[in-house]
């Protein structure tokens, strides 16, 4: 039977519960335990797929096509366990399912209520597919005291009673703020947060206290006294210089040992943290550095490109170099700001995924700069589409080339995908289809051209990558684009959908329709990012 670890947050949001869950799971995994992490999101959206990146940050896509919270990216990067649809649920999805059952008459005339119907659905989600696991970590989004999270808190209260106190514990993440004027850390917010959680029937077993200054032993004792936990269960969590040092830091503070003790496990094997020490060494002791420009639409909020940021860091780790990222708003190149001055110092240019016309001409201008100046270029999703439009206009003589996403065009080099094959069979979409959950989502296979650059990067001719798009490069333009030097080096297995383009006459110019950043991990950098950074290192010696 799996044991459950419920992770809540108090005082303020953005305390890093997701990172804490990922780190704890990694520590348990390092001791030989089988783990899985799940996220409960209290918002009423069915999933984050239609939410603005400025509201939510990145949408993380799983192999099975789920659009999920960005925390699942942390979970997967830290544990190597592929996330799936059953690992993320929202209030909206739960209510959608319950209302559908009510309309079908499944409840046989009963009054449908938050308790038991909503709470039972939450518990079913937590317990699903856990027979082969040792630990299931469940992170509850939001902050204790929020109205939206009350059904989730009630559900974990019930679940703790149902599985037994020896099989479920609660870890509460709080803030211990430092008041500079007083020169003190203040524990009162933590006390009040724990009191609020306890009033809902959940007594924390362990407190993880986020703080910017070391937590004195006297303050740990004070928190333990007023929050009804052992002093050893009050774990300080100082700000870290890198997220990749957090697992080792938490182990040093005794988090994993205290969790095991709470379960009565006193003979657990010692953790093997060799891989984490190696990652820390590569991150903290680089042997060089490169500067990568990311020309995007949502650059004012880096969380919108969270996996991309981390994948670039992983590429740097592979070659022991520090990757400096310059976030460049594509729109500034449409306002006649100096393109050369902004792009010339860069060792590589990356155009990431996105939606809509805004900033598209700036991205196309960046692609042209990279092509003409022989600067390593990496285009992802929309970035590949921009590379194809740039090629059509400037090397294939198709002056009016554009995307139907941006409006009517006589030369639709990029257009809406209307049909494709998925694991569920033939998928069909139209211009009036609902936006939510209707894109080409999840893992799809692709075949690479033998002897192509991208095949040498991967070391194979067959790959599987995750997608999230509803527009695709129009295969009818392939011949003209290839005559202009842009080669289609990766296609869907049926040969219908372009997946990868490259320029053989360029030092490193690759565009991909998928999102390789979603599969990159610190101990297993994605080959495309490792290759891109390697090319940037070579470029840095030329600048």
From Swiss-Prot:
Name under which the protein is recorded: CTP synthase
Active site: 381, 515, 517
Record-level Gene Ontology MF annotations: ATP binding; CTP synthase activity; glutaminase activity; identical protein binding; metal ion binding
Organism: Sphingopyxis alaskensis (strain DSM 13593 / LMG 18877 / RB2256) (Sphingomonas alaskensis)
Catalysed reaction, written as an equation: UTP + L-glutamine + ATP + H2O = CTP + L-glutamate + ADP + phosphate + 2 H(+); L-glutamine + H2O = L-glutamate + NH4(+); UTP + NH4(+) + ATP = CTP + ADP + phosphate + 2 H(+)
Entry keyword annotation includes Ligase: yes
Record: residues binding CTP: 13, 146-148, 186-191, 222
Transmembrane segments: none
Biological pathway: Pyrimidine metabolism; CTP biosynthesis via de novo pathway; CTP from UDP: step 2/2
GO cellular component, one term: cytosol
Positions with a binding annotation for Mg(2+): 71, 139
All residue ranges annotated as the Glutamine amidotransferase type-1 domain in the record: 291-542
Free-text function comment from the UniProt entry: Catalyzes the ATP-dependent amination of UTP to CTP with either L-glutamine or ammonia as the source of nitrogen. Regulates intracellular CTP levels through interactions with the four ribonucleotide triphosphates.
Quaternary assembly: Homotetramer.
InterPro entries: Class_I_gatase-like, CTP_synthase, CTP_synthase_N, GATASE, GATase1_CTP_Synthase, P-loop_NTPase
Family from the record: Belongs to the CTP synthase family.
Pfam families: CTP_synth_N (PF06418), GATase (PF00117)
EC number: 6.3.4.2
Residues binding UTP, per UniProt: 13, 186-191, 222
Other comment: CTPSs have evolved a hybrid strategy for distinguishing between UTP and CTP. The overlapping regions of the product feedback inhibitory and substrate sites recognize a common feature in both compounds, the triphosphate moiety. To differentiate isosteric substrate and product pyrimidine rings, an additional pocket far from the expected kinase/ligase catalytic site, specifically recognizes the cytosine and ribose portions of the product inhibitor.
Record GO biological process: 'de novo' CTP biosynthetic process; pyrimidine nucleobase biosynthetic process
Key words, A-Z: ATP-binding, Glutamine amidotransferase, Ligase, Magnesium, Metal-binding, Nucleotide-binding, Pyrimidine biosynthesis
């Amino acid at each position: 039977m799996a044991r459950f670890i419920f992770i809540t947050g108090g005082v303020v949001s953005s305390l890093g519960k997701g990172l804490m869950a990922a780190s704890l799971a990694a520590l348990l995994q390092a001791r030989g335990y089988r783990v899985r992490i799940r996220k409960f999101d209290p918002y009423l959206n069915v999933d984050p797929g239609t939410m603005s990146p400025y509201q939510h940050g990145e949408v993380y896509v799983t192999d099975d096509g789920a659009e999920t919270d960005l925390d699942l990216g942390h979970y997967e990067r830290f544990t190597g366990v592929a996330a799936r649809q059953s690992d993320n649920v929202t209030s909206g999805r739960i209510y959608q399912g319950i209302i559908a059952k009510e309309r079908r008459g499944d409840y046989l005339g009963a009054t449908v209520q938050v308790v038991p119907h909503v709470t039972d659905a939450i518990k079913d989600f937590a317990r699903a597919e856990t027979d082969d696991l040792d630990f299931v970590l469940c992170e509850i989004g939001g902050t204790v005291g929020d109205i939206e999270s009350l059904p989730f808190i009630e559900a974990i209260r019930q679940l703790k009673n149902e599985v037994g106190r020896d099989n479920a514990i609660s870890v509460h993440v709080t803030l211990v703020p430092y008041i500079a004027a007083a020169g003190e850390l203040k524990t009162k917010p933590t006390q009040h947060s724990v009191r609020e959680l306890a009033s809902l029937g959940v007594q924390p077993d362990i407190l993880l206290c986020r703080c910017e200054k070391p937590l004195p032993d006297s303050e740990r004792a004070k928190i333990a006294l007023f929050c009804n936990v052992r002093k050893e269960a009050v774990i300080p969590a100082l700000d870290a210089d890198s997220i990749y040092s957090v697992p080792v830091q938490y182990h040093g503070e005794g988090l994993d040992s205290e969790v095991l003790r709470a379960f009565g496990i006193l003979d657990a094997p010692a953790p093997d943290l060799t891989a984490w020490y190696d990652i820390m060494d590569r991150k903290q002791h680089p042997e060089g550095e490169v500067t990568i420009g990311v020309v995007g639409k949502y650059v004012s909020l880096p969380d919108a490109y969270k996996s991309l940021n981390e994948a670039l860091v992983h590429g740097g780790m592979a070659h022991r170099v520090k990757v400096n990222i310059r976030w460049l708003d594509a729109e500034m190149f449409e306002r006649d700001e100096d393109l050369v001055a902004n792009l010339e110092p860069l060792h590589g240019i990356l155009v990431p995924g996105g939606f809509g016309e805004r900033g598209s001409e700036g991205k196309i201008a960046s692609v042209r700069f990279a092509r003409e100046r022989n600067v390593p270029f990496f285009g992802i999703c929309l970035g590949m589409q921009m590379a194809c439009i740039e090629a059509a206009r400037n090397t294939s003589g198709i002056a009016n080339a554009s995307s139907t996403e941006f409006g009517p065009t006589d030369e639709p080099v990029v257009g809406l995908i209307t049909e494709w094959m998925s694991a569920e069979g033939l998928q069909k979409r139209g211009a009036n289809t609902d936006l939510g959950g209707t894109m080409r989502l999840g893992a799809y296979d692709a075949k690479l051209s033998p002897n192509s650059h991208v095949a040498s990067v991967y070391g194979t001719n067959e790959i599987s990558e995750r997608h999230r798009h509803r527009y695709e490069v129009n295969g009818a333009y392939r011949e003209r684009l290839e005559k202009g030097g842009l080669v289609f080096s990766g296609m869907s297995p049926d040969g219908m959908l372009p997946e990868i383009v490259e320029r053989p006459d360029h030092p490193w110019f690759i565009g991909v329709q998928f999102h390789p950043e979603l599969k990159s991990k610190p101990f297993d950098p994605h080959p495309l990012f490792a290759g891109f950074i390697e090319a940037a290192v070579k470029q840095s010696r030329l600048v």
